[in-house]
Amino acid sequence: MSFIRKKSMEFLKSFEVPAKNPSEEAQRRWRDAVGTLVKNRRRRFRMVPDLDKRSQAETQRRKIQEKLRVALFVQKAALQFIDAVRKTEHPLPELARQCGFSVSAEELASIVRGHDTKSLRFHNGVDGIARKVAVSLADGVKSDDAGLRAEVYGANQYTEKPPRTFWMFLWDASQDMTLLLLAFCAAVSVAIGLATEGWPSGMYDGVGIMLTILLVVMITAASDYKQSLQFRDLDKEKKKIDVQVTRDGYRQKVSIYDIVVGDIVHLSIGDQVPADGLFIDGYSFVVDESNLSGESEPVHVSTANRFLLGGTKVQDGSARMLVTAVGMRTEWGNLMETLSQGGEDETPLQVKLNGVATIIGKIGLAFAVLTFTVLMARFLLGKAGAPGGLLRWRMVDALAVLNFFAVAVTIIVVAVPEGLPLAVTLSLAFAMKKLMQERALVRHLSACETMGSASCICTDKTGTLTTNHMVVEKIWASGAAQTMSNAKGFDQLTSSMSETFAKVLLEGVFHCSGSEVVRGKDGRHTIMGTPTETAILEFGLAVEKRARIEHTGAGKLKVEPFNSVKKTMAVVIASPSAGGRPRAFLKGASEVVLSRCSLVLDGTGNVEKLTDAKAKRVASAIDAFACEALRTLCLAYQDVDGGGGDIPGEGYTLIAVFGIKDPLRPGVREAVATCHAAGINVRMVTGDNINTAKAIARECGILTDDGIAIEGPEFRNKDPDQMREIIPKIQVMARSLPLDKHTLVTNLRGMFNEVVAVTGDGTNDAPALHEADIGLAMGIAGTEVAKENADVIIMDDNFSTIINVAKWGRSVYINIQKFVQFQLTVNVVALMVNFISASFTGSAPLTIVQLLWVNLIMDTLGALALATEPPNDAMMKRPPVGRGDNFITKVMWRNIVGQSIYQLVVLGVLLLRGKSLLQINGPQADSLLNTFVFNTFVFCQVFNEVNSREMEKINVFSGIFSSWIFSAVVGVTAGFQVIMVELLGTFANTVHLSGKLWLTSVLIGSVGLVIGAILKCIPVESGSDASDRHDGYRPIPTGPSAV
């Protein structure tokens, strides 16, 4: 036994793949290990990517990148190389002319795709192109014209593989080799039956098999098609991206698929360029073209290099872009068509269960051969003793041998559990659909599965733990702090500051901002930007209204956008309050800005020296704000000489300190407590002031008395030994850089073997999201770069949603364990019953039709019932599954072995002594007994299915009616069993059972519930592991030892 177990473990090592980015070698290894023992390759590997097609797609991608590389670095020959023809004229289509356009779609596309500066100059630059596509660079496209533009220049859609129809799934399900063999046997059986027994009795057996095969194929295809619809809906959600455009003179959001040629698109850090286009204006604009060209060097886009390619990512700065080509006229469109051939990687659990299915299939094949051998041996021995011996064969004998072969094939149908890996897909599809309703979009199948094992969550603060609805609660200005939560506070502030101070303050608020105030169609002001910027701009609008001072527009001479590394943003404007002279404004993290200030502006507008004493008072105000859980930002300015130089690094004059309130989300404290109860450590990683971070962390229960709060600079200066000592205690990391988050995640996974989930929203979070076991991007605040590198998108940016993902992840894992336990029990009993009966009686009690029905119960219907059970709160009261834990636990083996022994003993006794025990007599005694055995076997499985809902708890009926799918499947199974026995006897080889025998069958099956309860009282492990739970989770210790 130990030898078999050892060999099985060695074999299953081939089926170990990482959850993220598995190598091609690992993927090919498990495919090779599966071998030829597969009933239906089309269905079993439908969700498994074709590695050869993926390789071809990668080759095509490299070709596209090579062409673009030529376009970027050999611009003179770019168009000739890309189009493989000499430059030709692009005739203007009549439709375009009639619509008022004077340039063709092909010519527009070739300008950007080939970086053709000569053609751009020929068309008089961006302004000339704008005129030829009939658009104003200020007002943008008219919404009423969008449909016409899509008709002339094309829609921003990419060619995708057509969705699979139901008939395709029906075809896949019918390609099962064992079912095809059975269909052949059924056809031969009909032919022989008609020849020997005549019409219609001679056709019953064969037609019964055919009808059952048809039923199996239909139900399988329907289940698979339903899954495909769910995945299709999820895929549509994944591709939803909104971009900001100017249309009808107003800024607004539209879907990336609604972009048309002529649109004016606004781009900022982290955005994906939605189509090919030309740079209009912007600041410090840098894009990453590596996914198209393969070159890692960032590209600076400006008036000197205006070409923007769809699919590239904005790395820095902001800009406006004129769209010139969309959809399949862009290289990104061609690349997307190629990449769609690759498919998604299979999950580790799917691969592992392919290994389990292969082992069980080999055992089943051996039993099928043994059963056929035993049946044939007994038949030949009986025939040898009959008159004529082995030399005399009749049609009846041929029919008997054919039946033996069909029984053996049917055993293989039952024994090879191809439903195991497919059940994972079913469970994941169900979970992903439910999570979508709960505002979590799972981008990768494996993430949902892995999240169930998460032992640590590294979360942002802003927007995740807090509401992200920010307001300026307090302000330090003119040497004093003011509360701004009501009208009185604003009145006190405006009355204490001079007009000079107010103008400088408002200039800084409105011009040193990555957001902007725009007027909507209804005439109301709308702020487009981040919540932090929105809070400050709303404060500025309120001050303007009360002080009756309007800020004056000013041209921006230079801009340094905010990023999470510098923690500041800066701008140089031609300041109206300084007579049009250049003035630099600096805004950002309080400590950073304050350290670069040497002067301070008082309430009268005079500049004073920022002495050490004054600096300490400002720092005290910042600390006081932070201790009240307020985010703090400083605003400063400096008059500069000239307009084209660098933004000053120091020597600024401090204007004000803002204390911004971002309230804790409702339910966050309870969600954090749920994490702790589930054995999941929560760590806050934020760029905020450490006092702000500590206050919020204490409020939501993350920071405890024995936990550590550390700042990023201190953390990154630790050596590996110090990190090994301190990381387990870290609960808060403040003033951190994205690199610090990446380092923390890497060490948690490497040093401590933790399964780490990480939240992120910025472009610079991409490395940490990629490194983590589960990357969680914010759907509202997150950039497109962050979302692309994430495994799950939290649509509402809510920490409680992350807990739902973890709960559903655990549910998937446990549900598959339940299904495996149920299916293995059915497998063992079905194989042993037919083998033992063949050995002792020379016939198989379970006929072909009956075995196919059993296969349907344990495969498709069993997966539907058990793999779609919703999660319960008890799942979050146990620590997570470890990386190295066995999927099939000792508790599962206990239940499988116990139930199998009970069923085998009962069915064995019935087969050998059933007639006398049940007092069955008469000419139909054998048929009656076989029907009773079949009926009892099915009801044993029905009650075992109920038993499998809980692998450890005795109460298996808890929440059974909340799982309507489970209840429906059990009801349908029982109902169809009645129909098979009472109405389809001719085809199913059954006879009518009396009420007494029906009751006896059900009672024997229900005793399985009692057996299950007794088994759950039997301890399966000793020592510290004795408390391991049914699903691989260990219960949390209680009492003094839990501390």
Curated annotation (Swiss-Prot):
Cellular localization per UniProt: Membrane
Main location as per UniProt: membrane
Active site: 460
Activity regulation as described: Activated by calmodulin.
PANTHER family in UniProt: CALCIUM-TRANSPORTING ATPASE 1, PLASMA MEMBRANE-TYPE, CATION TRANSPORTING ATPASE
Domain observations: The N-terminus contains an autoinhibitory calmodulin-binding domain, which binds calmodulin in a calcium-dependent fashion.
Name used for this protein in its record: Calcium-transporting ATPase 1, plasma membrane-type
